Amino acid sequence: MTNYREIAWQGLWKNNPGLVQLLGLCPLLAVTATITNALGLGVATMLVLIGSNILVSLVRDYVPKEIRIPVFVMIIAALVTTVQLLINAYAYGLYLSLGIFLPLIVTNCIIIGRAEAFASRNNAFSAAFDGLMMGLGFTLVLAVLGATRELLGQGTLFDGADQLLGPWAKSLTIHVWQVDTPFLLAMLPPGAFIVMGLLIALKNVIDKKLKEHQPQVATEPSVTRARITKVS
């Protein structure tokens, strides 16, 4: 029986694609200058993850093991192309902001990794839930990273939200403080490396605290057995 709580825990925290597996670092560090770009890339990746997991699970019994990886990549590429065309049609500003990193979702190790490790061995519903949790965990990391960098670099949050949600979302921009000159370190990839390292360190500290508060399981002391031989 599938343990959906464990799947959710693995995707959102314990085995988070961004903080633990450190997959998809190239787009994660490159396009998270704002929370809008981060959410756009995260949602696109999550949709591809869910779709690819479902399709891989459905065809797993019909694809020979020798050619399964090329078939999985073709499925992923078709889904990425579909998502790319949809974003181009309905969120053109976001499409321009994400640039080359949108089609590069095809090569994201998160997607092919879940297809091989989970979707190809489980039913479609479990695979879809795994894709949702892994995609959501990745999106949360992107959002936190994007929000932190945008706040430090520009003093705003949700700047350019209209690119993702439409013209009505211009009012969502929050000016936290006035910045005369953008803090370039936070806006450039080196700043993303620093913030990402701090997020990983924070997760490790939280994991350590959680482990310390877990009840210790008492173990019985080991008993050494001695063989006694009768001496005549």
From Swiss-Prot:
It is a multi-pass membrane protein. Its main location: membrane. Keywords: Cell inner membrane, Cell membrane, Electron transport, Membrane, Translocase, Transmembrane, Transmembrane helix, Transport. It is found in: Cell inner membrane. The chain crosses the membrane at residues 18-38, 39-59, 69-89, 93-113, 127-147, 182-202. It is an enzyme of class 7 (translocase). Its EC number is 7.-.-.-. Pfam families: Rnf-Nqr. InterPro entries: NqrDE/RnfAE, RnfE. GO terms for biological process: electron transport chain. One of its GO terms (cellular component) is plasma membrane. It comes from the Bacteria. Part of a membrane-bound complex that couples electron transfer with translocation of ions across the membrane. The complex is composed of six subunits: RnfA, RnfB, RnfC, RnfD, RnfE and RnfG. Belongs to the NqrDE/RnfAE family. This is Ion-translocating oxidoreductase complex subunit E. The lineage of its organism: Bacteria, Pseudomonadati, Pseudomonadota, Gammaproteobacteria, Alteromonadales. The gene is rnfE.
